[in-house]
Amino acid sequence: MNWIKKTLRFGEKIKTIIKARATKSEIANSDWTSCCKGPILKKDLEENLWVCPSCNKHHRISPHQRFDIIFGKNNYEVLKTPIPQDDPLNWNDAKPYKDRLRAARKKTGMDCGMMVVNTNIINLKITAIASDFDFIGGSIGAAEGEAFLYGIQHAIENEQPFVVFTSGGGMRMMESLISLSQMTRTTLAINELKKNNLPYIVVLTDPTAGGITASYAMLGDLHLAEPGALIAFAGARVIQGTVREELPVGFQRSEYVEKTGFVDLIVERKDLREKIGSLLSILLKKNSAINSSENETSEDSRTLTKAAS
């Protein structure tokens, strides 16, 4: 057999191996997924709130899954938010932006990458928002900005605390300056919320990065984070290329960020409901250890910290 035939046969073997690989849709529809120690049944992972029982990795989840876990199934009302015109810039790269939006909507069942709900937590009515990383990487465009502003407006009109679960890589490239302007809009909206003396709690989940970190994710009255969540502005390689120094291990993970003061508490997913409820009770001075205007001293601040722990 000459070398040409050997090459052709080798090529056929490669094709066979590639064909044998599972497709993205097959992986998504499989009963199995993988984590630290190999395959794990999705059913087992779901029963553990999508947290790996071996390594405690908090897997990414959709807004519906998150709200079901924290507020309970059928215990929240999804609010209809305004949806501006799709693709105002007629963006087209490897794939037209309108096609990307259609695919994201089909995949997630959402009109945009942010879900706003009216709900309650431990007998406190609140407005909550969560982003879906599966919707174009959780990036923020005009529609997501409108959803955020709608949530703030709803919270102010109903005098409710505002809780945000962040997840995403930043502002959406396909909307250029329209996307970047959402950083300003969300910041101004948060200022209005604070003028009305309404609590604003941010729960940082994996990943929270880019313009999200540089705007509404870091403006909360309190910042909670799930264990192991990536919290960053620029990527580690970009930073290392700029400073040209060895970076600390895990310096963009929630545990390290807590040590540097950007995160107040790291909370397990299973404990988020109780922790958010306790903190809101303290901030609103309802049935909590902090219940009078006298609690403004450093001693009382320690009481607040103890009650929240």
Language model: regions and residue ranges:
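Conserved catalytic cores of soluble enzyme domains
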Residues: G169-S288
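Intrinsically disordered, low-complexity segments enriched in small/flexible residues
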Residues: M1-M110, I121, L279-S309
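Short, basic, glycine/proline-bearing loop/turn elements
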Residues: C35, L101, A130-S139
